Amino acid sequence: MREVILLRTLTFYEQVRCYALDAGTFYATYNVAPPLLIFIGHSVTAGKTRSQLSRDDKLSLSDVQELVIFLHRVLQNENGWVVTAINAILNGEAGLKREDGGDIFADAFRTLREDRLDGGVIYADILRRIFHAKSATTAAGLHLVNLKSAAGEIGLRAGATDQFFGVINIGDAAHFLKLVEEQSPEIAVEEEQFSGSLFQAINRQDSPINVLLGSKKFIEGWDSWRV
């Protein structure tokens, strides 16, 4: 599972990198907005106690919590696992094969291969472009911030950075954060009283948000040119 999510993140990074080469032309000429990485859970948990949660509700919490743990591990990069995994993917050593025995990602990540970027360079650039972190030291783990003035929203920050890179809209933010504190105490949980809605501003050209985590409610009535 971890490798699959990393592959999605690496694909998103390649899109971000390509967009940044000529963002002005993409937006002004073709109305192409900056890309957004989205992970969707099963359903909404708003207004429900733990005992009232349906199977889908619990799956949604589990999905989003797993993604949060993944982001935390990416930012920590313990024993350099992210760099090692990226190198394995680009070198055709990820262990995922086609029926003919060839590497399933042989034709993927073409620009990264053409530029001969190694895992260390790519990881440092992922921290900068996606997580707004200047270095691995700055990143140093995930911080979840309960946005008290934006109901149901949780901001995502990388370590000591002061800019949000992502947002969770799970319905009942307090309930979700309590689960994280109980089951993943290594992840920092904070709150802010006066931050505005990150989700509502996600389509703005100057939005710092690169990652959106949430539930199926986004499928119904929500749209974005960034997806």
Regions found by a protein language model. Give the residues of each.
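Short, hydrophobic/amphipathic alpha-helical patches that form generic packing surfaces
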Residues: 7-18
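Conserved C-terminal RecA-like helicase domain
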Residues: 20-212
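Structured mid-domain segments that build the active-site/substrate or prosthetic-cofactor binding neighborhood
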Residues: 214-219
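A short beta-strand element within the Helicase C-terminal
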Residues: 223-227
